[in-house]
Regions:
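Short, Gly/Pro- and small/polar-rich lid/capping loops
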Residues: 1-5
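A short catalytic or substrate-binding loop motif that flags glycine-/basic-rich loops and adjacent residues
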Residues: 6-10
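Residue-level marker for the onset of beta-strands and adjacent loop->beta junctions
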Residues: 11-12, 118
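ATP-binding glycine-rich loop module of kinase domains
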Residues: 12-37, 86, 90
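N-terminal structural segment of carbohydrate-active enzymes
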Residues: 19, 24-27, 36-39, 62-75
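Conserved kinase catalytic-core helix
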Residues: 37-51, 89-115
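Conserved structural core of kinase catalytic domains
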Residues: 53-99
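Catalytic activation segment of kinase domains across protein kinase-like and atypical kinase folds
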Residues: 113-142
Length: 142
């Protein structure tokens, strides 16, 4: 088991690699927002529309020992290649930025927003950008 090095800032959850799996632990701090987003159906809608990285609820097979205090678990597909914004060419930066903005607008239209706007929340599946941080999606409040 190895926590992803880039997954340490958000008290709502962490991403870890375990037995060739990508898992996201949701901790108590993230339960209210995650529950609201999940119960609204917006996660499945955004996944279905290709905006958001797919996620499944994994079978409970002893995962709690990997991240004590985790309340919920998500499992994501393993990406063939992980890249970072400082490695991207201009066209990839542009595609990622436009995806991020369009995704945020789509969320706002459904009563949700993003808690942060970091380029590190975008990865590429082939040449297509996809948002990867499910716990950054929160209910919009005036």
């Amino acid at each position: 088991m190895k926590f992803d090095a880039g997954s340490f800032r958000d008290p709502s959850g962490r991403v870890l690699r375990y037995e060739n799996r990508i898992l996201r632990a949701v901790f108590e701090a993230g339960v209210p927002q995650f529950g609201a987003v999940k119960d609204s159906g917006v996660l499945n809608e955004m996944i279905g529309d290709g905006w958001l990285m797919p996620a499944e609820t994994p079978a409970d097979d002893g995962l709690d020992a990997l991240a004590p205090g985790a309340i919920h678990w998500l499992e994501h597909p393993v990406l063939d290649f992980v890249s970072y914004p400082y490695e991207w060419c201009f066209s990839a930066l542009k595609a990622a930025a436009l995806h991020h903005l369009d995704f945020h607008v789509a969320l706002l239209g459904r009563g949700f927003t993003l808690s942060d706007a970091t380029a590190y929340n975008i990865q590429f599946r082939g040449t297509k950008p996809v948002f990867i941080d499910h716990l950054s999606i929160i209910p919009y409040e005036e």
